[in-house]
Each structure stands twice: as structure tokens, then as C-alpha cells.
């Protein structure tokens, strides 16, 4: 199973401070993991420090995907997660 440590993060463009990663799994579901803050220093994602993450469940392919709001995992994005909690959710997504 894929874990947080296997995610590859990239910086946001357009003056957003933070990073993002996306991974699509073999079952057609995936995960988006982000953390960002505004230029004035306030966190804009569902995080409150640099050790928390926000995730969304994805459905699709690497080229074309959408946020999926209809899984048993969540019907929204989930914030304030540790790396370990992100890994736990990644494993659940891979088992869908």
C-alpha cells in the first residue's frame, strides 16, 4: 500500500505559499494532499501549522480527475491531519 512518504510534493504557483501532491491509485480513486497559507501568513487550507495536512478523495485518472464526495471515507475535504492520519486515509482509499 502507498503511504504519505511516497507522495511527491510541488510548490503552488501564483504567490501561494505551500505545497501539494496528488496520487491516483490502481482502483481509480486517489488523494490530494495540500497545505498552504496566504501571503500575509494565515493558513488558508484546513490546517493551522506546518505539520498538518488537508486531503480530498479523488476519482479518475492522472490526467482527468474530480474530487469525490460520495465515498464511505468522507463527503468533504478533511483537514488538520498528521502524516500518519493521511497514510491511514490513503490505505482506506486504496481498499475502496
Which residues does each PLM region occupy?
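Catalytic phosphate/metal-binding cores of nucleic-acid and nucleotide-processing enzymes, i.e., regions
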Residues: 1-96
